Amino acid sequence: MRYKKYFRKTSLKQKGVGDFFLNEVKKKSPKIFLEVGVFHGVTARNVCELLYKIHKNDFKYIGLDLFEENNENKSEVIPSTLFSNPLKNIYFKYIKKQNPYSLEAVADFLKKFKDNVNLIKGNSKSVLKKIDMSKIDYVFLDGGHSYSTVKNDLECCLEVVLSNGTIMCDDYNFGHLPDVKNAIDEFVKNNKLNCRIICDGRFAKIEK
C-alpha cells in the first residue's frame, strides 16, 4: 500500500519512508492502533485506510496530540506547522478555513472513519497513563522529542510490548538531538526488550 500525503504536511514525507512504515504496520495487522503525535493527521489517515482494508470496520485508531502550538510544546522539537507551498496556505486559510493542525481540522480529515477514530487533545505526560494499554496492539511514537517526554511515553506504553504488541519510534537517528535515541536505548536495556533499528536508522521497533 502506498503512503499518500493528501496535500498536507507529514513527518514521513521522505521518499519510501511512508511506504516502509505502512508495510511494517501491515505485518502486524493491529486492530487497535495508538499514535502519539498526530500532527496534520496524514499518517492517521493512511493507517486507517490500511486497517480498513484488513479488518473492515473492526479496528480502532487512537490519536493523541496537543493540536496547537503553545507553552507545553514550545521546548519540544516538532515539525513546522507552516506550509512552504503558498497554494496550500491559500487552500487551508481561504477555502477550508481551517488550521490543519487543529483538532477540528484533523477530525474533519478523518471523518470517513469517524466511528473508528478517537482523537485526544492533551499532553502525553498526563493523558497516556489514563489509556488502557492492555487493549493496544501497536503504538507509533512521534510526539515530543525531549528525553523526559520520550522516556515517559515509552514507560506508559510498556504494557503494549509485554502483551506481545509493538512500539514503533520515529526519529531514532535524530542526529542533532540525541535525546530520542538515549531514551529508547535506556528503556530497551532496563526492560530487557528487543529493539531493531530499521529504515536506515529512522525507526526503532521495540518488541518483547
Give, region by region, the residue ranges found by the protein language model.
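S-adenosylmethionine/decaboxylated-SAM
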Residues: 2-11, 15-208
